Amino acid sequence: MREMPIAMDICPRQKTWEEYKYEIEALKKSNNCNSEKEEIAFARSFSFSVMKFLWRNVNYKKRWECRQIKMVSKRLDIYAIRLAKDIADYFITLNIMEYAYLMGAMYTMLLPDSYRSDNGVYYTPPSISERLLDLLAAEGADWAEDKVLDPACGGGAFLVTVANRMLGDYRIKELSAIEKIEHIEKHLSGIEIDRFAAWITQTLVDILLYSETIAAGRRLKSIVKVQDTIQCIETETRRFDVIVGNPPYGKIKLDEETRKLYSRSLYGHANLYGLFIDASLRILQSGGLVGFVTPTSFLG
C-alpha cells in the first residue's frame, strides 16, 4: 500500500527587519560605487524603488500617482529590485509610524558615512517621537488647534506622527474628508534641506491621508519645503505654536553673515542643533512650545 505524502506548509516565513538590514548592508557593499556621488545616487534609487512599491501597495484605488522627484539615479539590478519589493511588502504589515522610521533609517544606512556625518543625519524611533509629543501635550500642545512645524523633517518621524494625532483628535474626526485635508495643510509644515528626504516625508504623509484624499476627491498639497532652515529663517513669515523634531547634530563652519545672525547663541564652535533651537525661537508664537531631541551635552 502506497504511503500518502505528508502535507507541508510551504508558505515562506516572514523575514525580520534585522534580516532585511543584513541584506541591505550586503547590497551596499556589493554595489561597487566609485565615488560618494554614486553612493548617494544608489541610496536614493533603492529607497525610491521601495517607496514606489509601497505606494503601489497602498494605492489600491489606483487614483493617485506617487509624487515625482528629480534626482540623479543609479540603475538597480534584478536582485536589488526584488529586495526593494520585499521590503515594501514587509513595511505594509507594520503601522505607518513604524515603517516611516524604518524607511528613514534604511535611507540613512545606504548613505555614505561622510555624508551622514557632514549633515548630522539621524532618524527618530517611534517610541521617542511619541514620548516627545506626549511631553508637549502635557505642557499644553493642542493637536487640533496648534500650528506645528518640524524644521528638519526628513524621514517623516514627527510629521507623520503629528498628522496622525491631529486626525485622531475627536474634533478633527467630526470634520469631512476635505476639511481634514485642509486642516493638515493649514496646521502642519515641514522644512528639510535634503530634497530626497523631503520627498520621502511628503509621500509618507500622503499615505497616511490616502483614504481622506480618495473621499475628498483631491490630493494633499505639499506641506514640506525644501530649504535650509538655518539660512531661510530671516525670510520665514509664518509663526508656529509648536516646533518639534530631531535637529541635526555636529559642528558647522559659518560664514560671517550667518555667524552675525546667530551671534546671540554662539559660544565657540557653532553646533547645528544649537542653531536650530535659535532659529526655531525666532518663528515661535508667543507662549509657544519647542520640543527637540538633543544630545546630553546640551544640558552642559
Task: Enumerate the predicted regions with their spans.
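SAM-dependent methyltransferase catalytic region
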Residues: 62-90, 94, 98-300
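A short N-terminal interaction module
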Residues: 2-113
